[in-house]
């Protein structure tokens, strides 16, 4: 039975019959963005913990540094596997059910990591990493959920505000390790395990925020507004791919996001190795990575405003140009740590522009259930692109060095930018610009 808080507010059918309805929808849009942003802050603690603390725990439980990246890899795999499933669940049952399910699985993953540290069990740690990766898929879907009730005038801004709140998790999550000693004394848990207790609590708090705050469900309201409420159905992967082929602007946007994400992960993951090889200390490496993360997320609202004003396609291409410029700066930096830091900052800003603008194009280009399916496909592909970029980066670094890695990365970004421009211009001959 549907509870009163779940009922979807009716959207005016003939224009002008319900003068207050547009204002009601706008208030609901703003509230939805705030709820998603709050959940992103709480759930983001887990993502920040996986990258830093997960690698330390992996070394401790496996007994070798060779498995240091295993938890991050497992988390990335979990995000990729979950993205399509959560998108299908959103189409069938709404955003609230999809996001809540993902957060519950991620919280279970954090508990599994704690159990792995207590037992100890390295295989259980990897299982926990996969489940925590579902939280990454929730973060990705949340940015699209923020656009369910948006218009073309606010779509990029709404999306970017949710992306921006990821900054909190990226910064605070790794630093929870400083509370570990105190938590060990209070709980008796093994070293590093308490960080994932905090992560589990954050994920559960995010689940409560989503359950309480996303009422009515924004996807239900959007379906009522757009006249697609009765079209909820499972969209197979082949149908999503066929839909993407019929919408070249979205296809180009997805390609741009994949290229920017793969290059970002490849260059970022190998930069600490390069810097330490040129004498940089751990503190300097940490500062450089922190500035890069700040550039990725902190400027997202500004990027969203520019995309709404100038058009997301222009901002997407500008982001690709910044990625190329960043690779060029890093490639010629050598042992100049200042240049490397500048390059990583440009890389983060380029990633932000490409991701925010590309996501806005995907969110506004395809109607009905196919839109959510393509969003899930995009999220899964981004996770796989990041995993592929990180995996190949080490091989390329060993073969041609840091400068060569950046040259290859720049070439990938240039090729992707050209394809984005070509397919988008072809689309504009048939369809109006996004």
Predicted regions span which residues?
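Intracellular juxtamembrane helix-capping segments at the cytosolic ends
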Residues: 54, 137-151, 353-367
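C-terminal membrane-cytosol helix-exit motif in multi-pass small-molecule transporters
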Residues: 177-182, 200-225, 419-424
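Cytoplasmic helix-loop-helix junction between adjacent transmembrane helices
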Residues: 128-165
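C-terminal transmembrane helical hairpin of 12-TM major facilitator-type secondary transporters
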Residues: 299, 310-358
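C-terminal ends and interior cores of transmembrane alpha-helices
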Residues: 104-119, 322-335
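Helix-to-loop junctions at the C-terminal end of transmembrane segments
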Residues: 82-95, 181, 298-312, 397
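Juxtamembrane intracellular "pre-TM" segments in multi-pass secondary transporters
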Residues: 9-30, 215-255
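Hydrophobic core of transmembrane alpha-helices in multi-pass small-molecule transporters
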Residues: 41, 122-137, 339-353
């Amino acid at each position: 039975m549907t509870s009163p808080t779940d009922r979807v507010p009716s959207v005016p059918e003939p224009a002008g019959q319900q003068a207050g309805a547009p204002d009601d929808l706008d208030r609901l849009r703003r509230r939805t963005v705030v709820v998603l942003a709050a959940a992103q802050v709480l759930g983001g603690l887990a993502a920040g913990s996986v990258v830093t603390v997960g690698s330390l725990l992996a070394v401790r439980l496996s007994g070798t540094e060779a498995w240091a990246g295993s938890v991050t890899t497992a988390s990335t795999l979990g995000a990729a596997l979950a993205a399509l499933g959560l998108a299908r669940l959103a189409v069938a049952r709404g955003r609230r059910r999809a996001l809540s399910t993902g957060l519950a699985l991620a919280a279970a993953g954090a508990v599994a990591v704690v159990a792995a540290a207590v037992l100890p069990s390295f295989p259980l740690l990897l299982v926990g990493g996969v489940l925590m990766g579902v939280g990454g898929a929730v973060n990705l879907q949340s940015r699209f959920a923020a656009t369910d009730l948006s218009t073309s005038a606010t779509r990029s801004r709404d999306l970017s505000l949710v992306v921006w709140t990821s900054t909190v998790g990226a910064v605070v999550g790794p630093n929870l390790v400083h509370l570990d000693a105190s938590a060990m004394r209070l709980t008796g848990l093994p070293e590093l395990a308490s960080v994932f207790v905090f992560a589990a609590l954050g994920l559960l708090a995010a689940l409560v925020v989503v359950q309480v705050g996303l009422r009515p469900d924004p996807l239900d309201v959007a379906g009522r507004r757009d006249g697609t409420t009765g079209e909820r159905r499972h969209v197979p992967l082949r149908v999503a791919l066929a839909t993407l082929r019929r919408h070249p602007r979205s296809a180009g946007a997805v390609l741009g996001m994949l290229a920017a994400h793969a290059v970002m992960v490849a260059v970022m993951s190998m930069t600490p190795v390069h810097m330490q090889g040129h004498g940089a200390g751990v503190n300097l490496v940490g500062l450089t990575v922190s500035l890069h993360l700040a550039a990725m997320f902190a400027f997202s609202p500004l990027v969203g405003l520019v995309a709404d004003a100038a058009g997301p396609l222009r901002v997407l291409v500008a982001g690709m140009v910044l990625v190329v410029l960043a690779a060029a700066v890093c490639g010629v930096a050598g042992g100049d740590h200042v240049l490397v830091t500048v390059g990583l900052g440009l890389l983060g800003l380029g990633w932000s522009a490409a991701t925010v603008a590309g996501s806005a194009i995907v969110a506004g280009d395809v109607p009905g259930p196919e839109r959510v399916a393509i969003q899930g496909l995009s999220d899964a592909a981004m996770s796989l692109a990041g995993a592929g970029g990180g995996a190949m980066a080490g091989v390329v670094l060993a073969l041609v060095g840091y400068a060569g890695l950046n040259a290859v990365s720049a070439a990938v970004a240039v090729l992707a930018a050209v394809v984005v421009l070509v397919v988008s211009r072809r689309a504009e001959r048939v369809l109006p610009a996004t």
